[in-house]
Amino acid sequence: MTLSSEMSEASALAEETDIDVVGEEDDEEDEEEPQPRHRRRRRSYAEDEEEEEEEEEEDAGDLHDDALLPRSPVRAGGGGGGGGGGGGAGGGDGPGGSRPPSRGGPQKAAAAGGGGAGGGGGGGGGAGGGGGGGGGGKNSLVKPPYSYIALITMAILQSPKKRLTLSEICEFISGRFPYYREKFPAWQNSIRHNLSLNDCFVKIPREPGNPGKGNYWTLDPESADMFDNGSFLRRRKRFKRQQLPAPELLLRAVDPAAFLPQPPPQPPQQPPCAYGPYGCGYGLQLQPYHPHSALFAFHHPSPPPRQPPAAPAGAPAAALPPPPPPPPPPRRRAPLLPAAELARTPFGYPHPLGPALAASLHAAKPGSGAAVARSPFSIESIIGGGPGPGLGAGPAPGAGGSCASQSGAATGLSRSLGSGLAPAAALPAAPGLAARISNC
């Protein structure tokens, strides 16, 4: 009993002493440790501030050297870094402070990381400012003071053939002006619209043997003085094209000499008259005919018929025909007749009797020379409109002689009409002639 009681008392005392020792050690640690911990934290915060100040000075020096942005973005970045450091320090004062061995290192690392992140943010702001300064340099390109019409005209005039496609025009403008080179896709449609809507530009279709895409564009020759004194800065007025046939436009556009001043066109010459006095007087555009044509021999006046020499009494009735008359002088027309005489003839022009017709009449009717001399021959007597004044004055000398003489005269008349008159003038006389011959 005594041993057990002693052992129990000893164990209880040992437990009490152990508990007291542990509590004392904790109290001692609580009393001793806070001062170094606060000192360490203050030292770390001061070091972080020094590092941040050094980074701010370096960033500010770089920005002053480059002269791109003011110091306000850098200060904002520095403030962010300081805030990160403060956050790290606050984390160290949190509940984890009761166990310093396990959490002291991570808290310091977090504080240092926060400060570094803040400094990095400030550096990023400086980089962004540098990028903005570079963008301002690109916008310094100035737009040329030329209109799209002037740019297109420049491109076409510098080409050897004075014609270009849309892609070639855009290539010239991009190579000449840097502003349009930077903004190439935006103004291509404007060039296309100006080519289509302005009359000073003419579209030329591509030749069949010339492969490629797109039509050619050239300048209208009449729009050469479109700009004042050759300056492309100002146009005089809007050019309007005159209505010209399409083939002439194409020929003038393809030929480089078409840009020179053209002489005034000459008035068209009227063709000579070919159908008597009604040809030119009534505006009939007829084809000229050869002046020596047999169909128009009646335009030239024939000389008076020669009387055959008196045949002896014993000579036969059929005499040789007289020699042909000399050819009429060329390019001479008969004088115009009055309206009454033109109305008497069926075609509106005189029909003088040829020498062959007069000779045949004399050969067929030797006894009726006085009647023929008294009354001229008329076409109305052949058509059937009525006998002539001389023929109907007295009775015929004899039935047999009259029929023979009329048949001979009809034969000679038909030959003369067939050789000296047009076919249209000889055809209407055929029915009346056949009727008179049948009556005989």
Swiss-Prot record:
Its main location: nucleus. GO terms for cellular component: nucleus. Residues 15-33, 47-60 have a biased composition (Acidic residues). InterPro entries: Fork_head_dom, FOX_domain-containing, TF_fork_head_CS_1, TF_fork_head_CS_2, WH-like_DNA-bd_sf, WH_DNA-bd_sf. Residues 1-14, 99-111, 402-417 have a biased composition (Low complexity). Residues 1-135, 295-334, 388-417 are annotated as: Disordered. Coiled coil: none annotated. Residues 76-97, 112-135, 388-401 have a biased composition (Gly residues). One of its GO terms (biological process) is cell differentiation. Retina. GO terms for molecular function: DNA-binding transcription factor activity, RNA polymerase II-specific; RNA polymerase II cis-regulatory region sequence-specific DNA binding. SUPFAM superfamilies: Winged helix' DNA-binding domain. Keywords: Developmental protein, DNA-binding, Nucleus, Transcription, Transcription regulation. SMART domains: FH. Residues 301-311, 319-329 have a biased composition (Pro residues). Residues 143-237 bind DNA. It is found in: Nucleus. May determine the nasotemporal axis of the retina, and consequently specify the topographical projection of the retinal ganglion-cell axons to the tectum by controlling expression of their target genes. This is Forkhead box protein D1. It comes from Gallus gallus. The gene is FOXD1.
